[in-house]
Regions:
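Glycine-rich anion/phosphate-binding loop at the beta-strand->alpha-helix junction
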Residues: 131, 157-183
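Catalytic alpha/beta active-site cores
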Residues: 1-164
Length: 183
């Protein structure tokens, strides 16, 4: 960490509850304002966010100084497995979004475009499907009473990149351009 790492990702598989004590052990000796913290989690994303918030508050860190995110993405789970691990996935997305509202630089919704690429879609299809998934999150959450200005900044996209270097760069640039026009 002291030699240039600026982002950490923790893969927390399984469906067990994650406690504040677990989070304290995980984040021991990590300067949370200096390093972006990301979580890839199973079903219990809410307990991970609760534990993370508790550690941040205990350390007295201002929420706006925290950077990172968590992979709350029921559409990707549905695409990959045909089901979600909870009955009302978009309600959970909304709850997690509201829970982390003060954390301006912490993304709580991830659009997993890589799933489309890994399933055989072309670069253009991956881009189109990913943007459509992002719009679906905007639609569901604005229908649930949230404002687009609350939702859009909390969404991040996770794209795959392949060996077609210049096409992949064009895809990423097009994604930024098109998403800016959507929101």
């Amino acid at each position: 960490l002291n030699r240039g790492v600026n982002s950490l990702g923790f893969v927390l598989n399984g469906c067990q509850e994650f406690t504040k004590a677990d989070m304290e052990v995980l984040l021991k000796d990590i300067c949370l304002e200096c390093v972006e913290i990301n979580f890839v989690a199973g079903c219990k994303k809410g307990s991970i966010l609760d534990a993370f918030k508790a550690v941040v508050e205990e350390r007295g860190i201002a929420p706006e100084k925290i950077q990172g995110g968590i992979n709350v993405d029921p559409l990707t789970a549905l695409t990959r497995k045909g089901k979600n691990c909870c009955d009302k996935p978009f309600e959970n997305v909304k709850v997690n979004l509201e829970k982390m509202a003060a954390y301006k630089n912490f993304k709580t919704i991830e659009v997993g475009g890589y799933v489309f690429n890994n399933s055989g879609s072309s670069i253009v299809q991956e881009l189109g499907f990913s943007l459509a998934a992002g719009v679906e999150y905007l639609d569901k959450l604005t229908d649930a009473g949230m404002k687009i200005d609350e939702v859009a900044p909390k969404i991040r996209f996770h794209f795959a990149t392949g060996s077609k270097y210049f096409m992949e760069i064009a895809k990423l640039r097009a994604a930024r351009y098109l998403w800016a026009h959507i929101v």
